[in-house]
Amino acid sequence: KLNIPTANYVTFDNYVDSMNYLNSCSFPLVIKADGLAAGQGVIICNSLEDSTEAINKCFKDKTFGSAGSRVIIEEFLEGEEVSLFTLVDNTGFVLPLITAQDHKKILEGEKGLNTGGMGAYAPVPSITKSKMADLSNQFVLPIVEYLKKQNINFNGMFYAGLIITKKGPQLLEINVRFGDPETQ
């Protein structure tokens, strides 16, 4: 709707359709529980076997509770992940605060399963103040303006999870809270 760059994706609300789709996919890809999953609902899958296990966690094992009743299967994006924190208000004001980078993987060297976060640092050295302003204008401002047009008043923290790819920055997620562990 807003032409914000993000991964190509499809959504499914049942096991059979998601498995049928996966049989036509190339890997790696990402499977996400479509809801709050304590930072553990994103699974990078390198094979059909990995994907089947992820789909089973969502639909059969109910590992993520109601968050796993709908899944997002999306293109795997490669690059540097950055959390962009801004304050916004319902007038369209956007104040970029800081960028941070967290370490999600359970094992050293960014290996293993995702966790809620193993630690973070801020600011991200590769993101200058000028680049941070550009990212805010590209990713946050269009959403804030859209909310305003829809008569949705939002004031507060807006956190954009981004990945800087060879094709340019892409949106991974948005939250309306401070990040954890980034704010620690």
Feature map (PLM): residue ranges:
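Internal nucleotide-binding/catalytic subdomain
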Residues: 41-183
